[in-house]
């Protein structure tokens, strides 16, 4: 997955994806936010899987 696809999926899943990516800390990402995980070099696909795991109520079509 490319960063662009991650950002597109974030936009589909969250009303304010920029704030979510900046402020929500995920234990699934080693205690990092989405933006921090990207800066640390984590793969976008792994980050997306962490976001999905952190949000079990996410509709199946977005998983």
Regions found by a protein language model. Give the residues of each.
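C-terminal alpha-helical interaction appendages
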Residues: 1-63
């Amino acid at each position: 997955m490319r960063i662009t696809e991650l950002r597109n999926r974030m936009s589909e899943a969250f009303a304010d994806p920029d704030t979510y990516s900046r402020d929500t800390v995920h234990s699934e990402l080693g205690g990092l936010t989405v933006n921090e995980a990207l800066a640390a070099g984590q793969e976008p696909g792994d980050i997306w899987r962490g976001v999905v795991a952190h949000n079990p109520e996410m509709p199946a079509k977005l998983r």
